[in-house]
Amino acid sequence: MSGSVLFTAGERWRCFLTPSRSSLYWALHNFCCRKKSTTPKKITPNVTFCDENAKEPENALDKLFSSEQQASILHVLNTASTKELEAFRLLRGRRSINIVEHRENFGPFQNLESLMNVPLFKYKSTVQVCNSILCPKTGREKRKSPENRFLRKLLKPDIERERLKAVNSIISIVFGTRRIAWAHLDRKLTVLDWQQSDRWSLMRGIYSSSVYLEEISSIISKMPKADFYVLEKTGLSIQNSSLFPILLHFHIMEAMLYALLNKTFAQDGQHQVLSMNRNAVGKHFELMIGDSRTSGKELVKQFLFDSILKADPRVFFPSDKIVHYRQMFLSTELQRVEELYDSLLQAIAFYELAVFDSQP
């Protein structure tokens, strides 16, 4: 094991590496959680410096953080490697690389204001980064919450609860071997768009990357913008070799959708594409028999009728689109287009489980 020394306001703390975290990470966690100093100097608490929406006056960051806090933040920014910086969630991806490159090209950071000279750092994001460096949340603290445990089982990758609470619209996407379907719903559970496409030539012959790109790009071009794009995550076993062609197709589709729909990930490191557990949706709507999920066709049919007959339906279809959606549904009755039904059910479950109430 190796040690890391953190110098702050004339004092000296030492914390040792653990197998799963960097020394800088735990050193700053100890800094945040240690007992208050007995010195007369007052350290500004988090509740006062955490105003991330404040306007940017001159030397704003110096006024938000005490000299002791500034020294701790600068210590991390000037000494941590790219890997150590990525221990802080807000510094994952390109941001950590940009910090190290800026440090190598222009020397150590002299003050917090200079961090805003680094690409991808604006005033608000700089305040967020400084706060996260001072008081990072440990994995143990996150695991204590039953809410977080449930969300980790429901959605991948992990998403902050605040982002889920603030969502205004999502596009739920379900694809199979022959077709893809999507449903666009806002937080009032109004169906803004609901479509399917089965005119593709995937899984015919070789698995050509260029063909997948062309087909999926064409489909995505028809989708409106949304806060999140939610993909269905199936539980097919890799142990069954006969399912390998289907698994390969699913993984290619998933990778393409993650790459094409996560348009700002390289800049801000924020995921917009999520994968949602298929069986969790089935359990939510009581469609599971053992480990198998039954068709949601009749449930979707009932939702369509309820939207017309009930004053407060579970999901709302706009009056100018309800006829079109009913005709689309009726045209699939002989084919049993499960992707179409499942895309709508997944969207409803996302709001009811992850946005409105995170407990089943």
UniProtKB/Swiss-Prot annotation:
Role summary: Transcription elongation factor which increases mitochondrial RNA polymerase processivity. Regulates transcription of the mitochondrial genome, including genes important for the oxidative phosphorylation machinery.
**Which cellular component appears as one GO term in the record?**
ribonucleoprotein complex
Q: What is the lineage of its organism?
A: Eukaryota, Metazoa, Chordata, Craniata, Vertebrata
Give the primary localization class.
mitochondrion
Example GO BP: mitochondrial transcription
Q: Listed GO molecular functions?
A: DNA polymerase processivity factor activity; RNA binding; transcription elongation factor activity
Q: Which UniProt keywords apply?
A: Disease variant, Mitochondrion, Mitochondrion nucleoid, Primary mitochondrial disease, Transcription, Transcription regulation, Transit peptide
Q: What protein does this entry describe?
A: Transcription elongation factor, mitochondrial
- Extract the transit peptide range from the record: 1-35
Which Pfam families does this entry report, sorted A to Z?
HHH_3 (PF12836)
- Family named by the database record: Belongs to the TEFM family.
